[in-house]
């Protein structure tokens, strides 16, 4: 037998640590009051690499204002994908669980939670991620009760898209009935939400711009006119559709050349609201056009309101739920849903621009 090259206790030390850790986990399980030992979650362990599904241990004790939710669905936002490939402005520390929008059922509440009870159906916003899992813990202020008429899948597609559209159209642009709204990337989740609110709630005329094969759903949601921007010039088409006046409000999510074309067809005293850069090109805004047309370029990042104006953020979701309950909305539109184990396929569907509306991860599939 070969002699040990190092003391046996050093060889056995890692095994001892592993056994000790296993014992600690078992003790945690035994103390867990609801009997829930672990839950499955999507993990980003390395930027740009495939996501994996792993078991995570439940947080044993809730904070006084926290709520534990059994997640049924998690909506995918493009920001989730950008975070996982390292191209988002916010850089989560690795490893992390992606996912911002969730829906599910309350299973436990902290001692000072007054707005929610066990069994409530809710939607929620995970400001720090963590939604692509079977369970998450959120402050009560990040959750909303949902009506029975709203499915969990739909609820996971509501807050960010409709909240952004609401703040942009209502608070940034003060949209009025009869005005013209141009929506780029109109077949995406935010685009369809903007079309839905502008046409069906605020009474505006809506022009939706997207690829030809996706324009049917844009019209079904409420657009009165559409533009295939792979074949048609946005500026010329908008001028034609508005008798030369241009669009009063532009919800712009593409950037690059599309943004430049949009700025050239804005109405006098109009608003252009950049809400994303799907093209990957961040445009420069020529101030001379703003001056001559007396128009405004107003940025909108919905998530920042949680810090700077939480009351408006909450209003944006409250009002959206009210519109849904009153039957004013045609969406949210879901083009596909996947189980946790198919999350990489879901991301690819979005990256390859094969989706319309929202793509959702369902934990119960």
Curated annotation (Swiss-Prot):
Keyword Protein biosynthesis: no
Pfam families (UniProt xref): ADH_N, ADH_zinc_N
Keywords, in A-Z order: Oxidoreductase
UniProt superkingdom: Eukaryota
Record-linked CDD domains: QOR1
EC number(s) stated in the UniProt entry for this protein: 1.-.-.-
A molecular-function term among this protein's GO annotations: oxidoreductase activity
Family, as annotated: Belongs to the zinc-containing alcohol dehydrogenase family. Quinone oxidoreductase subfamily.
Name by which UniProt lists this protein: Quinone oxidoreductase-like protein 2 homolog
């Amino acid at each position: 037998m070969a002699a040990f090259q190092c003391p046996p206790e050093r060889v056995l030390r890692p095994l001892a640590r592993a056994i000790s850790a296993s014992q600690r986990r078992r003790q945690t399980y035994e103390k867990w009051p609801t009997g829930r030992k672990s839950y499955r979650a999507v993990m980003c362990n390395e930027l740009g690499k495939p996501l994996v599904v792993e078991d995570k241990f439940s947080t044993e004790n809730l904070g006084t204002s926290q709520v534990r939710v059994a997640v049924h669905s998690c909506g995918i936002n493009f920001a989730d994908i950008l975070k996982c490939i390292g191209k988002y402005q916010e850089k989560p520390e690795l490893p992390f669980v992606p996912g911002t929008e969730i829906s599910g059922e309350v299973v436990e509440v902290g001692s000072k939670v007054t707005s929610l009870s066990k069994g409530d159906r809710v939607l929620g916003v995970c400001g720090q991620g963590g939604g692509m899992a079977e369970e998450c813990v959120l402050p009560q202020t990040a959750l909303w009760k949902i009506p029975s008429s709203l499915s969990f899948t739909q609820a996971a597609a509501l807050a960010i898209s409709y909240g952004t559209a609401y703040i942009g159209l209502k608070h940034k642009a003060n949209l009025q009935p009869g005005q013209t709204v141009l929506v780029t990337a109109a077949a995406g989740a935010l685009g369809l939400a903007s079309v839905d609110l502008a046409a069906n709630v605020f009474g505006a005329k809506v022009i939706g711009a997207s690829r030809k094969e996706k324009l049917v759903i844009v019209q079904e949601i409420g657009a009165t006119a559409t533009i295939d921007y792979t074949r048609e010039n946005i500026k010329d088409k908008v001028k034609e559709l508005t008798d030369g006046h241009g669009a009063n409000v532009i919800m712009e999510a593409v950037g690059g050349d599309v943004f430049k074309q949009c700025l050239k067809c804005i109405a006098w005293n109009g608003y252009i609201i950049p809400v994303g850069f799907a093209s990957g090109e961040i445009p420069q805004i020529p101030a001379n056009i703003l001056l001559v047309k007396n128009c405004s370029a107003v940025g909108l990042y919905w998530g920042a309101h949680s810090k700077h104006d939480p009351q408006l953020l909450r209003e944006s979701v409250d009002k959206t739920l009210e519109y849904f309950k009153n039957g004013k909305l045609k969406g949210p539109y879901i083009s596909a849903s996947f189980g946790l184990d198919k999350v990489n396929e879901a991301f690819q569907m979005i990256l390859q621009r094969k989706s319309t509306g929202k793509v959702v991860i369902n934990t119960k599939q």
